[in-house]
């Protein structure tokens, strides 16, 4: 089957909203919305392999550290795992006083009862009710008319009141989502929400949340903004309602839809870090927050260590962040074009500490989010002839990890600037050897012994230290590398590890690459090459460790 010559026979444009006096186009966002992360619920349910409890707790702690104050933790009635996770958060004291747990439930009494039971003992909680309201869901999925769909919402809302009253020690906030809101007739969406409001009887002092999802993105962002402005004008008791947005990215405009929705009067935004979620993902909270930041608005979220946050998200979701992803991708602060590089160089030369940021091609100062300037201008001395990475792969079988490519290209650029000449493949390899493989001070690996004990690795290494001293370090861990890190006298965090074979047969060698941080410093890479893969990995660690310590010493001097 191929694309239709006349797609109007199969698809139709979404109807516009009659709102000739719309005001949102002339407004600007002046403050951060209330943020709600749905990573542990909407994000988790979209993963090929959902997170286990350990990963969920790690993710929860990261969200708290970043500063997210409302976190949708799970769907407690969906599984015992989700129920138990909520209990763990409450019973083990993982919910700070300024943070509110949110959970989701469908509109059935047994599920609602189970949901409230999961929250027993919580100081405060948001309980989130939803049912779909759009024509296609009414007709195709539920076989219900409008009254039937409205009754589902109203009856469930009454059950919320009933079960909340049984746990008066908790400060409850109720949230209702007319799922598929953006594909629902506005008058009917308002009718259902007004009916729920009537049951919950909110006040300006104790508000409810009405969450208005673009469950599937069906129109351009301006139409969604019109829907939000129309709804904000017409919903009952607006002063007692928090209007929340929940955008997906099916048309690639989830960020724009959310920003226009905030301009149209919304108070709150739900989403996921780096845009994980069903299909094309939920709106990306990181991009939303940093878009505000680069407009001079405090986003109320802290991404000072954006690479550390990305590491947690990638490991928990088991999904990579795209190298072109806004703000956090490996390549977003990198210029390959000569004219771009020239403009950036001139911008850095004129930029003064404390002045407004005006470096061309860089909408944010990379240092603000924990990035170094070294990756900004990546010079390829063999531009048009394959590049540094291509030459190393083709001539020497060395495949540098992406972030190390960025780091090493700066070393090459420094050498080409010094020589005033292009570098051959042999010269590039010699520079790699000198920079990484000969990084033997202050600690040089002499030998190592590895043993397996009760499923764990035990490592003892002999190290040549400064002043001809001999050191012996011992450590245990789940693998050889983890055991070595445990035995180091310095706090080291491994950010990334890669390995591959060089050549084949009896002459094959192993190459190992490590990215690590020493004592919370900036990430540094190391390389090790040896016939034995364990030895290669140890050499790579010492290479990175020595390079980091040398750089810290040089900076201190």
From Swiss-Prot:
<dbReference type="GO" id="GO:0003852">
    <property type="term" value="F:2-isopropylmalate synthase activity"/>
</dbReference>
<dbReference type="Pfam" id="PF08502">
    <property type="entry name" value="LeuA_dimer"/>
</dbReference>
<keyword id="KW-0479">Metal-binding</keyword>
<dbReference type="Pfam" id="PF22615">
    <property type="entry name" value="IPMS_D2"/>
</dbReference>
<feature type="domain" description="Pyruvate carboxyltransferase">
    <location>
        <begin position="33"/>
        <end position="307"/>
    </location>
</feature>
<keyword id="KW-0028">Amino-acid biosynthesis</keyword>
<dbReference type="InterPro" id="IPR005668">
    <property type="entry name" value="IPM_Synthase"/>
</dbReference>
<dbReference type="GO" id="GO:0009098">
    <property type="term" value="P:L-leucine biosynthetic process"/>
</dbReference>
<keyword id="KW-0100">Branched-chain amino acid biosynthesis</keyword>
<dbReference type="InterPro" id="IPR013785">
    <property type="entry name" value="Aldolase_TIM"/>
</dbReference>
<dbReference type="InterPro" id="IPR036230">
    <property type="entry name" value="LeuA_allosteric_dom_sf"/>
</dbReference>
<keyword id="KW-0460">Magnesium</keyword>
<keyword id="KW-0963">Cytoplasm</keyword>
<dbReference type="InterPro" id="IPR000891">
    <property type="entry name" value="PYR_CT"/>
</dbReference>
<keyword id="KW-0432">Leucine biosynthesis</keyword>
<protein>
    <recommendedName>
        <fullName>2-isopropylmalate synthase</fullName>
        <ecNumber>2.3.3.13</ecNumber>
    </recommendedName>
</protein>
<dbReference type="InterPro" id="IPR054692">
    <property type="entry name" value="LeuA-like_post-cat"/>
</dbReference>
<dbReference type="Pfam" id="PF00682">
    <property type="entry name" value="HMGL-like"/>
</dbReference>
<dbReference type="GO" id="GO:0003985">
    <property type="term" value="F:acetyl-CoA C-acetyltransferase activity"/>
</dbReference>
<feature type="binding site">
    <location>
        <position position="246"/>
    </location>
    <ligand>
        <name>Mg(2+)</name>
    </ligand>
</feature>
<comment type="function">
    <text>Catalyzes the condensation of the acetyl group of acetyl-CoA with 3-methyl-2-oxobutanoate (2-ketoisovalerate) to form 3-carboxy-3-hydroxy-4-methylpentanoate (2-isopropylmalate).</text>
</comment>
<feature type="region of interest" description="Regulatory domain">
    <location>
        <begin position="439"/>
        <end position="557"/>
    </location>
</feature>
<feature type="binding site">
    <location>
        <position position="42"/>
    </location>
    <ligand>
        <name>Mg(2+)</name>
    </ligand>
</feature>
<dbReference type="InterPro" id="IPR002034">
    <property type="entry name" value="AIPM/Hcit_synth_CS"/>
</dbReference>
<dbReference type="InterPro" id="IPR013709">
    <property type="entry name" value="2-isopropylmalate_synth_dimer"/>
</dbReference>
<keyword id="KW-0808">Transferase</keyword>
<dbReference type="InterPro" id="IPR039371">
    <property type="entry name" value="LeuA_N_DRE-TIM"/>
</dbReference>
<feature type="binding site">
    <location>
        <position position="248"/>
    </location>
    <ligand>
        <name>Mg(2+)</name>
    </ligand>
</feature>
<dbReference type="GO" id="GO:0005737">
    <property type="term" value="C:cytoplasm"/>
</dbReference>
<dbReference type="GO" id="GO:0000287">
    <property type="term" value="F:magnesium ion binding"/>
</dbReference>
<feature type="binding site">
    <location>
        <position position="282"/>
    </location>
    <ligand>
        <name>Mg(2+)</name>
    </ligand>
</feature>
<comment type="subunit">
    <text>Homodimer.</text>
</comment>
<comment type="pathway">
    <text>Amino-acid biosynthesis; L-leucine biosynthesis; L-leucine from 3-methyl-2-oxobutanoate: step 1/4.</text>
</comment>
<comment type="similarity">
    <text>Belongs to the alpha-IPM synthase/homocitrate synthase family. LeuA type 2 subfamily.</text>
</comment>
